């Protein structure tokens, strides 16, 4: 299999198209390979093929399906070097950071095999009740550009394990790794069980509105998530949404500053801040505020001296506008790292120092290497400020007292709270957002069950 020509995969076959589009290398803005743009006819054929494959696939046992996922994991890792090169190119990453995603993502192919989905039986004098979990049918997985492999596999694996057929739609900014992933999968799975369609912005709505697709699983912006909810309501589709998180960290005064600063800095700037659970708002106790900000800036110098680019120009423009607005408002900006490279989608990592808590720069999610550092004087104030957002994907608490940190964590309105460590997903732990950061959960047993529908059978004696 070569890694420099790209096709949609429908019914187990390569599909080209009259129209193609090309991604852009974020490092130098050069055009990448042409990829076929799916049409409405392609969508219809993919859905029809998935429906035809569904009966046989869903009738396999859970163990049979997870064994195939394990086999695919081995095959995928055998091509890890090629996927690392693809991720590095389409995302603008260093080879090392591309490898982090490629190898980390393999966990999602293996995690379903650690679970069993069994029926529940209850009995009384009159009847036996049998509760089973059945697959939904055809699932469309709509994925973003920041971690194209990991987030795709996090949707594909549980959907396939539970007996569904999947149509993957990658971001038009980063189609290449997904197209090759599904092409490779044809060596393991029956035709039409896993397909992939690359296209323009009209492709997602075609899938969401399709009457024969039973579920949408989506990661992306809150605005798009809301539109998916509206469109999916017409056919009452199941939806799982993971959307924006303007995530807060609380740094308590008893923290070991020297010990936590490297973790704070690493969490802020990894992947140029293009991480859905990265901190955007950092609330620091007033007694240690200046020291933490100074040490954070110092520790960030090495990390940001060769920071990677923003993945696409659209996001770069948004971030530059956010910094221009913050500067115009008179906020103190600490620009870190080297001067921005003119040829790529680069922006200097920036700390916005103590802006007003209600400032636009604080209340909006800046999806990139920008963090607002804000003073607080009391624990109640910190909790209020952290919760004063319409999003709630992730939060973190940093303290020398674990019991105190747990009490704070219990009061935070976020789906994922991390204590004394940077945010990182785990395939065995449910992951989802509160408020406008999502709907439903992924990963763990609840994530598997989100791709099922419950059937209760009553057998009277």
From Swiss-Prot:
The UniProt entry, under InterPro entries, shows: Ald_DH/histidinol_DH (IPR016161), Ald_DH_C (IPR016163), Ald_DH_N (IPR016162), Aldehyde_DH_dom (IPR015590), LUC3-like (IPR044086)
Q: Which CDD domains match?
A: ALDH_AldA-AAD23400
| Principal EC category | oxidoreductase
The entry's active site is: 242, 276
Which residues hold NAD(+)?
Answer: 220-225
UniProt keyword annotations, A-Z: NAD, Oxidoreductase
> Oxidoreductase: present as a keyword of the record?
yes
Reactions it catalyzes: an aldehyde + NAD(+) + H2O = a carboxylate + NADH + 2 H(+)
- Mind telling me which residue stretches traverse the membrane in this protein? none
Q: What is its EC number?
A: 1.2.1.3
- What SUPFAM superfamilies does the annotation carry? ALDH-like (SSF53720)
According to the lineage, what is the superkingdom?
Eukaryota
Q: Which GO MF terms are attached to this record?
A: aldehyde dehydrogenase (NAD+) activity
Q: What does this protein do?
A: Putative aldehyde dehydrogenase; part of the gene cluster that mediates the biosynthesis of the mycotoxin fusarin C. Within the cluster, FUS1, FUS2, FUS8 and FUS9 are sufficient for fusarin production. The other FUS cluster members are not essential for fusarin C biosynthesis.
Describe the family membership recorded for this protein in Swiss-Prot or TrEMBL. Answer: Belongs to the aldehyde dehydrogenase family.
Q: What name goes with this protein?
A: Putative aldehyde dehydrogenase FUS7
